[in-house]
Amino acid sequence: MKKALFYTVIMLAIQCGLGSAVLLIWALVTGQKPDVTNNSMIVVTTVVDLLIMVLFLALKWAEVSPRWIRTRPWAVLCWCVLASLGLLLPSIWLQELMPELPNVAEEALVGLVSSPWGYVAIGIMAPLAEELVFRGAVLRALLQWRPDNHWLGIAVSAALFALVHMNPAQMPHAFLIGLLLGWMYYRTGSIIPGVVYHWVNNSVVFAAGHIMLSVGWDVDNMKLADLFGSQTTVLMAVGCSLLIFLPSLFQLHLRLKK
């Protein structure tokens, strides 16, 4: 447990400390005040995630091995893609049913999504860095701590994964995904299924947000009913999504192995 908390604190310290340093360098080099209207947040997020990965790999806090991918689990990766696509709408719908939580990172997220370069930070670097840290390091340490109760480790790692986002509005979705990603890591011992799932999730969210911002939609206040036209259509869409997610989850249950 101590190792898992240590890794989480280190990641947060790098994000806050190094992020502030990169923002200062940005301001000195470009003469621009760092904010969400320019590329400073994209640069900061990308640099911080890259350095986090280098640190965790260099100090061997996270383990990355080609053993699992050498088994050629292409069908498993396809089911990961489908599972990610199938859970998106139900997760958003579930979040809308919950009491509204503060979205303290809304402005920053909109700034990242509004630029095509934001995909580097959201769609590429975030899945790699977060899976390396939270599954490759944090969950690995938790599974070693309590090998007799893997769901405890998975739940704790999912909670830490949700908390590190530091945005209450994102936490329910992050925790839900964290449980699934943790289970996939436990079954395979590899972060690759999680990276693929995470990449698809973030890519779809980025693409949808970018398109909606490009056409002038008010993404800040948009609900699923606004997008689909009625609550009935929303429920139909959620049901169709579950018809994708649940069979995908079943196939992963059958196929995931180390």
Residue ranges of model-derived segments:
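Membrane-interface helix/loop boundary segments of multi-pass membrane proteins
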Residues: A129-V156, W183-S190
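Hydrophobic alpha-helical transmembrane segments
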Residues: L5-V9, V43, L77-L82, P116, ...
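C-terminal membrane module of polytopic membrane proteins
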Residues: W199-K258
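Hydrophobic residues within alpha-helical transmembrane segments
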Residues: I10-I14, M125, V156-L160, P172, ...
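Membrane-interface helix caps and helix-loop-helix hairpins in membrane proteins
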Residues: L163-A169
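Juxtamembrane helix-loop-helix connectors linking adjacent transmembrane helices
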Residues: W26-A27, G31-S40, A62-L132, L139-W145, ...
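Structural signal for the C-terminal ends of transmembrane alpha-helices
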Residues: L55-S65, M184-T188, L246-L256
